[in-house]
């Protein structure tokens, strides 16, 4: 039987406010345990929550960016459950009237096509504290620094049909919230976490299968692996005559499998009711206009502009628009070099490889946009070849200066004098007289392969400095003359 996968995601984004959603406590990461928890965060009697307006502004900004309905009358509710790191015994969230309603996001896929994923809603809520198991022998410690940190939970429609589509969607959300400046997107620190709802159904069936939720997956790689693992489990279970039970599961990356955590709850299990300590939030049209005026150029628009303005492919434009910093870096390089495609290639390949190797972000790049753009100018004016440029790039990354300084200091200037190149070729051909005879006796098909040998020898003889185009032209003339 052929199966169709159905995936919906819930993405929890920690908002980059300076203080918590209902108290004045700091949200800074990495503080000593329980040093950033106020009486409000601890759920002490006699204290009342006060809504952080900046969290509201950030939620509205996201809603406008995904063309969503904005809940201009939205209500906070109490989500009741017991867990050691939830001091009040309930979480303040939103249920029936969220701040962001239906919207959508267009995401780029690997094959260069676009897919629209519906967004069901996005609601504000407070984060819980953190249970610490490893630091205590046979016991659990509770750190409430995180309790009350503002979260925007973004709930998608079940529109994704593969793990790769799910990852593409998470990457698009990740890029968007970073562009907006509402979340730093640091998955390692838990700033962006993902719950994956996965089910399968026979191909062609309209009705959904029974879904399982994989909780708190915190990397793109693990999202793909966790979903694929759960897909395999469900298919094997059904094909062996079993039945999928609705439950919450955890992904174990060491065993590459999901394991049950608890039975999956429904909304009524949490006994939601409006929080009597918080008034409904009323958002005026004037506030929406203010927020709309602050929206930057977003990834979809930037991607589209890169394609139209620079003639880039969907893939290249999508990669370069991944973050504002990378897009700005690329545009600066392209502006200096006057060649967007050359700039795109160097930013994505050479610079990307360097950053991955050194574990750096684009804003920490050891080669500035001005340096890279200046080097590309030297490729374009034939001062250096593409091969020599890699040596220059490496030297710039090691702090040896800009391209012109390195070229002069190391004597890397390309030889473009046809007389000098001709002399090098004559010497090289004389040293390879036997191969020259074989080339001249060979048919056209074999000559193509043999020609590469002579080009390699010529570049070696010139220490890589001869202009490759001139080498090709002169060499062809000499071999066939």
From Swiss-Prot:
<keyword id="KW-0436">Ligase</keyword>
<dbReference type="InterPro" id="IPR017959">
    <property type="entry name" value="Asn/Gln-tRNA_amidoTrfase_suB/E"/>
</dbReference>
<comment type="similarity">
    <text>Belongs to the GatB/GatE family. GatB subfamily.</text>
</comment>
<dbReference type="InterPro" id="IPR023168">
    <property type="entry name" value="GatB_Yqey_C_2"/>
</dbReference>
<dbReference type="InterPro" id="IPR017958">
    <property type="entry name" value="Gln-tRNA_amidoTrfase_suB_CS"/>
</dbReference>
<dbReference type="InterPro" id="IPR003789">
    <property type="entry name" value="Asn/Gln_tRNA_amidoTrase-B-like"/>
</dbReference>
<keyword id="KW-0067">ATP-binding</keyword>
<dbReference type="GO" id="GO:0005524">
    <property type="term" value="F:ATP binding"/>
</dbReference>
<comment type="function">
    <text>Allows the formation of correctly charged Asn-tRNA(Asn) or Gln-tRNA(Gln) through the transamidation of misacylated Asp-tRNA(Asn) or Glu-tRNA(Gln) in organisms which lack either or both of asparaginyl-tRNA or glutaminyl-tRNA synthetases. The reaction takes place in the presence of glutamine and ATP through an activated phospho-Asp-tRNA(Asn) or phospho-Glu-tRNA(Gln).</text>
</comment>
<protein>
    <recommendedName>
        <fullName>Aspartyl/glutamyl-tRNA(Asn/Gln) amidotransferase subunit B</fullName>
        <ecNumber>6.3.5.-</ecNumber>
    </recommendedName>
</protein>
<dbReference type="Pfam" id="PF02934">
    <property type="entry name" value="GatB_N"/>
</dbReference>
<dbReference type="GO" id="GO:0006412">
    <property type="term" value="P:translation"/>
</dbReference>
<dbReference type="InterPro" id="IPR004413">
    <property type="entry name" value="GatB"/>
</dbReference>
<dbReference type="GO" id="GO:0050567">
    <property type="term" value="F:glutaminyl-tRNA synthase (glutamine-hydrolyzing) activity"/>
</dbReference>
<dbReference type="InterPro" id="IPR042114">
    <property type="entry name" value="GatB_C_1"/>
</dbReference>
<dbReference type="GO" id="GO:0050566">
    <property type="term" value="F:asparaginyl-tRNA synthase (glutamine-hydrolyzing) activity"/>
</dbReference>
<dbReference type="InterPro" id="IPR014746">
    <property type="entry name" value="Gln_synth/guanido_kin_cat_dom"/>
</dbReference>
<keyword id="KW-0648">Protein biosynthesis</keyword>
<dbReference type="Pfam" id="PF02637">
    <property type="entry name" value="GatB_Yqey"/>
</dbReference>
<dbReference type="GO" id="GO:0070681">
    <property type="term" value="P:glutaminyl-tRNAGln biosynthesis via transamidation"/>
</dbReference>
<dbReference type="InterPro" id="IPR018027">
    <property type="entry name" value="Asn/Gln_amidotransferase"/>
</dbReference>
<comment type="subunit">
    <text>Heterotrimer of A, B and C subunits.</text>
</comment>
<dbReference type="InterPro" id="IPR006075">
    <property type="entry name" value="Asn/Gln-tRNA_Trfase_suB/E_cat"/>
</dbReference>
<keyword id="KW-0547">Nucleotide-binding</keyword>
């Amino acid at each position: 039987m052929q199966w169709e996968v159905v995936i919906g995601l819930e993405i929890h984004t920690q908002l980059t406010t300076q203080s918590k959603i209902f108290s004045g406590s700091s949200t800074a990461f990495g503080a000593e345990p329980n040093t950033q928890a106020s009486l409000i965060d601890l759920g002490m009697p006699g204290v009342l929550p006060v809504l952080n307006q900046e969290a509201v502004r950030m939620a509205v900004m996201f809603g406008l960016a995904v063309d969503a309905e904005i809940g201009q009358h939205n209500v906070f509710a109490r989500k009741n459950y017991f867990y050691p790191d939830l001091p009040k015994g309930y979480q303040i969230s939103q249920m029936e009237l969220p701040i962001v309603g239906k919207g959508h996001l267009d995401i780029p896929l690997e094959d260069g096509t676009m897919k629209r994923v519906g967004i069901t809603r996005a609601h504000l809520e407070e984060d819980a504290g953190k249970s610490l198991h490893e630091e205590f022998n046979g016991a659990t410690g509770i750190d409430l620094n995180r309790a009350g940190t503002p979260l925007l939970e973004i709930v998608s429609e079940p529109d994704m049909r593969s793990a790769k589509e799910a990852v593409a969607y998470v990457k698009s959300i990740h890029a968007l919230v970073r562009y907006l400046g509402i979340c730093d997107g640091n998955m390692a620190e838990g700033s962006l976490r993902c719950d994956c709802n996965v089910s399968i159904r026979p191909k062609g069936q309209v009705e959904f299968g029974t879904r399982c939720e994989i909780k708190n997956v915190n990397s793109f790689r693990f999202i793909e692996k966790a979903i694929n693992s759960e897909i395999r489990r469900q298919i094997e279970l059904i094909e062996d005559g079993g039945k999928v039970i609705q439950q919450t599961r955890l992904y174990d990356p060491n065993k590459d499998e999901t394991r049950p955590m608890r039975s999956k709850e429904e909304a009524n299990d949490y006994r939601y009711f409006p929080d009597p300590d918080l008034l409904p939030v009323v958002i005026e049209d004037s506030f929406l206009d203010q927020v709309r005026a602050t929206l930057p150029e977003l990834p979809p628009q930037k991607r589209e502009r890169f394609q139209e303005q620079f003639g880039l492919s969907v893939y290249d434009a999508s990669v370069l628009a991944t973050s504002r910093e990378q897009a700005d870096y690329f545009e600066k390089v392209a502006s200096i070099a006057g060649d967007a495609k050359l700039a795109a290639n160097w930013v994505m390949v050479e610079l990307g490889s360097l950053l991955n190797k050194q574990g750096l972000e684009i804003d920490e790049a050891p080669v500035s946009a001005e340096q890279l753009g200046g080097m590309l100018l030297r490729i374009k004016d034939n001062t250096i070849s593409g091969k020599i440029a890699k040596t220059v790039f490496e030297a710039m990354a090691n702090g040896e200066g800009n391209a012109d300084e390195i070229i002069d200091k190391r004597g890397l200037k390309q030889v473009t004098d046809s007389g000098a190149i001709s002399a090098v070729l004559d010497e090289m051909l004389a040293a390879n007289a036997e191969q020259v005879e074989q080339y001249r006796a060979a048919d056209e098909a074999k000559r193509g392969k043999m020609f590469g040998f002579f080009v390699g020898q010529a570049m070696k003889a010139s220490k890589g400095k001869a202009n490759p185009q001139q080498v090709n032209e002169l060499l062809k003339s000499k071999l066939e003359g």
